[in-house]
């Protein structure tokens, strides 16, 4: 339990690398990068796993990454959305339960869940299982009007908002997520992309 959010709180932010939507490759992989930071200022470490584009392995990859790492003083997991590598959907409750860490999901735009459900039904045999994961996520909370939203599992909304503020250095996205995005894109394309 987090009583007070300190400026040096240890957080882990995950983001994925690029991949090709038009690829005919089955089981195409992309990188999942986790950046461990003290607040928004000091990078403590980087974790990586490979995940399957449109697969079902992102939750396992995150759990394995956290539980097998040397970083035992993590306090919060930050995610940039709940879908990675296309429609590889994170099971937020399972991630929280199996790591023992609260999870805070940060997004810049409200996702169109109905459009996501339609796309899943059109392209996936296991669409209903993926849709069930989307539907069981907590409601979005607006932090910055029309610019930043979050949802949280295992942490109250006030504390989650404070974690986001403490870990954000510039702009709206927490620094661990911004750096994870840059590292993941550099691994996959040879050069980092802007957040």
Swiss-Prot record:
It comes from the Archaea. Pfam families: DUF99 (PF01949). Belongs to the UPF0215 family. This is UPF0215 protein TK2033.
């Amino acid at each position: 339990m987090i009583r007070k959010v300190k400026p040096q709180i240890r957080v882990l932010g995950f983001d994925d690398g690029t991949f090709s939507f038009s690829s005919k490759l089955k089981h195409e992989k992309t990188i999942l990068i986790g950046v461990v930071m003290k607040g928004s200022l000091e990078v403590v470490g980087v974790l990586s796993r490979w995940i399957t584009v449109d697969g079902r392995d992102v939750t396992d990859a995150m759990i394995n990454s956290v539980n097998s790492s040397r970083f035992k003083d993590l306090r919060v997991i930050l995610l940039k959305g709940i879908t990675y590598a296309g429609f590889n959907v994170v099971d937020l409750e399972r991630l929280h339960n199996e790591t023992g860490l609260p999870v805070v999901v940060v997004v810049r735009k409200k996702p169109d869940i109905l459009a996501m459900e339609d796309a899943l039904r059109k392209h996936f045999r296991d669409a209903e299982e993926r849709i069930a994961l989307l539907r069981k996520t907590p409601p979005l909370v607006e932090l910055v009007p029309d610019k930043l939203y979050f949802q949280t599992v295992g942490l109250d909304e006030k504390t989650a908002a404070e974690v986001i503020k403490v870990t954000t250095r510039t702009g709206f996205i927490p620094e661990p997520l911004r750096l994870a995005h840059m590292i993941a894109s550099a691994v996959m394309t040879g050069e980092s992309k802007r957040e």
